């Protein structure tokens, strides 16, 4: 019996796959529990259309992320922080600070996507990675200056 899995099933397959299972397993376990649907022509066609729509959406998100990465790479942020002698900061610069500076420039980026390569505890120039999409990262220059 051919079925289309609705959810991931251990030792059978992942959601969206068309798999061949024994008639009893399909009819008595997978179908009643809503883990799969029968692989009729209409269901297979609907699955293929859904996959195409998801792929198109994924491509669009990737293009938008690449455009955003290009804009962010040309950006330079200046953060004014309280600092003591020798440029040592009282505290450190966090992803929240960078998020707020980006919001001021018109970019709405979640702080979870901002990754520091090193701890920012002194004044100077740093580069921060912003993960926009799987495989798309932008480097933003951050100048930390004393108030």
UniProtKB/Swiss-Prot annotation:
Source organism, top-level taxon: Bacteria
Entry-linked SUPFAM superfamilies: L9 N-domain-like (SSF55658), Ribosomal protein L9 C-domain (SSF55653)
Molecular function terms, GO-annotated: rRNA binding; structural constituent of ribosome
Keyword Cell cycle among UniProt keywords: no
Keywords: Ribonucleoprotein, Ribosomal protein, RNA-binding, rRNA-binding
Protein name: Large ribosomal subunit protein bL9
InterPro entries: Ribosomal_bL9, Ribosomal_bL9/RNase_H1_N, Ribosomal_bL9_bac/chp, Ribosomal_bL9_C, Ribosomal_bL9_C_sf, Ribosomal_bL9_N, Ribosomal_bL9_N_sf
Family: Belongs to the bacterial ribosomal protein bL9 family.
GO biological process terms, semicolon-separated: translation
Keyword RNA-binding: yes
Family matches, as Pfam families: Ribosomal_L9_C, Ribosomal_L9_N
Role description: Binds to the 23S rRNA.
GO CC annotations on file: ribonucleoprotein complex; ribosome
